[in-house]
Amino acid sequence: MNNKVNTRDFIVVKGARENNLKNVDIDIPKNKFVVMTGLSGSGKSSLAFDTIYAEGQRRYLESLSSYARQFLGGNEKPDVDSIEGLSPAISIDQKTTSHNPRSTVGTVTEIYDYLRLLFSRIGKPYCPNGHGLISTLSIKQMIDTVYENKEESKIQILSPIISQEKGTFKNKIEELKRQGYLRLRIDGNIYSLDDEIELEKTKKHNIDILIDRIILNNDTVTRSRIYDAIEKSVKEANGKVIVLVDDKELFFSQNHACNECGFSIPELEPRFFSFNSPVGACKSCNGIGFNFLPDTAKIVPDPSLSIKEGAIAYFRSVMMTPTMDLKREMSVWKEHDINLDVPFKELSKKEKNIIFYGDEDIGELKIDVNEQSIYSSSSFLYNNGLVNLIMRRFSETQSERAREYYEKFMSNLSCPSCNGQKLSIEALSVKINNKNIIDLTEKNINDLTNFFIELELNETDRNIAHLALKEIVDRLSFLENVGLNYLTLSRSASTLSGGESQRIRLATQIGSSLTGVLYVLDEPSIGLHQKDNEKLIETLKKMRDLGNTLIVVEHDEDTIRASDYLIDIGPKAGDFGGEVVAAGTVSEVSENKKSITAQYLSGKLKIEVPSKRRHGNGKTIELVGASGNNLKNVTVSFPLNKLIAVTGVSGSGKSTLINETLIKGIEKKLTNPFIVPAPFKDIKGLKNVDKIIKVSQDPIGRTPRSNPATYVSVFDDIRDLFANTKEAKARGFQKGRFSFNVSGGRCENCSGDGLIKIEMHFLPDVFVKCESCNGKKYNQETLQVLYKGKSIYDVLEMSVVEARDFFYEIPEIKRKLDLMVEVGIDYLKLGTSSTHLSGGEAQRIKLAKYLQKRATGKTIYVLDEPTTGLHIHDIAKLITVLNRIVDNGDTVIVVEHNLDLIKCADYVIDLGPDGGINGGQLVAYGTPEEIIEKKAVSYTGLFLEKNMYKDK
């Protein structure tokens, strides 16, 4: 009997042992929508990404030449016996698409490429000086325009060969003389080529060849002379002609050029509209859209102070003993009678401009360089102002410390030349339906789709553009279908959340219409409101229906229930996971008694709605008039000593309200005057807060040496313990001996890494276990010091829960490890490198550290989507931890979409009603029950009701 699985229908994995996987065998059906779920850290990603996708990628790389492989890396075979039936694999994970400021939603999705093509084919250039449509002219059309003037007019036909260029142009003038030309018009004056012409090298010049002088008559000879002269001018000046008719000057061009002012643009081609090409980019900012410049908001961070009180932060430390720079500035302020004793905000606009940008018309002022008096007798020529002064000092200094000081007063500010639009004035002059290409990229996806659907074109343009238009509209609709209708194409890719980046790549893949591909996705529902979840699920099904296999690592219940096949990894996390607990349809898995996921799916386990909501301490923080990004003058109160959930559809303004306005606004007032929050009018109730802490999902350390034990400071206590053993004292070992970061106790062969990097040149670098320490990071003498039979390396290899039991009798160590267990990271090894931690794990490690601190009752903790990467069982633990912080007297604000967390909040602030320009309003606020009452206007209320009362 042949039990071999047909690899045409299944991906057959045998003996997967990557990370914590325990010799996993699994048959995954092809051309199905497969979801892998399980507790956080159970091994889902190890199976999906580190095993199945990694092997698919390795096989592809193996097919390339060794020369190509050296540039790609990453062809190490995963720890698995075999994988059969594997298709070409594409990973769509949560990593931010790009940190390059040039990368935007438009470039990542390739929609901008089609826009560039569209504008180069049917775009119409307009004069930026208000002279209307620019068109190309034939020589006949030029002559016809000349003949619109009265007969007997004196006309001169000139060829503009040099326009606003520096130089003496001696060689050019000599060449024109040899060609037989007699006269030139230089900077408006006529010169004979027989004259000695001397031009200033540093000055910009205009040089025109005088081709012919003619009396305008409507006879054949005159018309022929005009034709010949214009034709010659066109050849010499690359299509341009100037015709002087009496005192009137006419400008003509065979290229795109304005007849009135001469503004011209080159032939339209796609790269002309690229801010990544020198041809199209703004020359001032090189296509980035911003420049690093002095920021008036940082120079004067607190305008309620007077200048004498230190309003100007740049001079704050020298107000009592003025420096030369300050003396110069104050001399100018005195000249303009600027009052140094009134609050800076009460100065007039003109006075502020003088302070920031100087007064070039003021001439010479006197100052004494030797005395403390600020009004004096030595003269200097003034033209600075603080902005110019700081910019000059920043540009000229060679000192790194000085540069860091000047940078405190500088920001990336919108480029004044292109107003942040990245392109040259010529490219921005080309329009379709009165909109330039950047105008279109600044529309949200919804509005942009409608613009192209409703676009009216003549038959010729429609025939030219229909293919490009179809691609644009199709790709925009794919973005809408994954819930990104609030984004703009101009949005920088580096500002996108992990979930947004992943869904953009998802939309791009749909646009490619590939078939027979294995897609591996990591929680595509992250950051997505329940309102848009159905669209996302339909998109995933559409990818499956194209003939692809989808393996989706996911915790979202709706996505799990929509799957064709469900694989539950567990039963728990870390060393207690790594097994396939259940596999089959959702209904089959739901009946599995060993699966924690099954217990939640069947309703046997669930996160209960709290029996009562906390009333708080009666104090509030009120944010008044928040108007950053799409926020529409929002005023909102945050009741303190409560668990507050800030909700709303994707793009409604939650992150702007909390991360960019509330956090930065409070930090500016309390700790960092140089920080620049999004615009708001006021924050009331600051006396009720001593600090605000953002518990982000950023890594806990920048190097692989950082680990959970060092971050929560428990490793310090453990090293103290080892240093106090009899063996350590006998050998004279101090606490530092047990650190793998400094010389002494660490293995010097691998510098405490445990691994040695071997460069393979034409192959990827290989990391091998250090032979000196056998991968244990420490030298032999250090490892001989034991505590209860375990070395310091053995302790780092323990899981948190194992370490807690091991150090049960040491209260300080046990207390810190108890907190790590409480936040749900009991499965992590103490020595796990920070680079191997997920964002959710990093966030929970930070929570464990903050829980060590004594509550003040005045601290606000902010978490942005803390349920990212968490199984519902882990979310229950997280809610317990957040409740503990609030019960201790502090306040917790979570920006969240997860309904199980939202329903456990004491207070909900719901923004909306939709995303982008259709969001940014306070839709509802109050308890979850009060939000449900507003379900007619609140999408959150609508879905919250379904979640809270689904059993009723």
UniProtKB/Swiss-Prot annotation:
Binding of ATP occurs at 38-45, 648-655
Please give the Gene Ontology molecular function terms for this protein.
Answer: ATP binding; ATP hydrolysis activity; DNA binding; excinuclease ABC activity; zinc ion binding
What SUPFAM superfamilies does the annotation carry? Answer: P-loop containing nucleoside triphosphate hydrolases
Signal sequence span is none
Checking Pfam families in the record gives:
UvrA_DNA-bind, UvrA_inter
User: What GO CC annotations are associated with the protein?
Assistant: cytoplasm; excinuclease repair complex
Keyword check for Heme, yes or no: no
Which UniProt key words apply to this protein? ATP-binding, Cytoplasm, DNA damage, DNA excision, DNA repair, DNA-binding, Excision nuclease, Metal-binding, Nucleotide-binding, Repeat, SOS response, Zinc, Zinc-finger
Q: Where in the cell is it found?
A: Cytoplasm
Report C4-type zinc finger ranges: 258-285, 747-773
* Main localisation: cytoplasm
Q: A GO term (biological process) for this protein?
A: SOS response
Query: Which residue range or ranges hold the ABC transporter domain?
Result: 315-596, 616-945
Q: Which InterPro entries match?
A: ABC_transporter-like_ATP-bd, ABC_transporter-like_CS, ATP_grasp_subdomain_1, P-loop_NTPase, UvrA, UvrA_DNA-bd, UvrA_inter
User: What HAMAP family does its record include?
Assistant: UvrA (MF_00205)
Record-linked PANTHER family: UVRABC SYSTEM PROTEIN A
Which family, according to UniProt?
Belongs to the ABC transporter superfamily. UvrA family.
Its quaternary organisation is: Forms a heterotetramer with UvrB during the search for lesions.
This chain's function reads: The UvrABC repair system catalyzes the recognition and processing of DNA lesions. UvrA is an ATPase and a DNA-binding protein. A damage recognition complex composed of 2 UvrA and 2 UvrB subunits scans DNA for abnormalities. When the presence of a lesion has been verified by UvrB, the UvrA molecules dissociate.
Official protein name in the record: UvrABC system protein A
From what organism does this protein derive? Malacoplasma penetrans (strain HF-2)
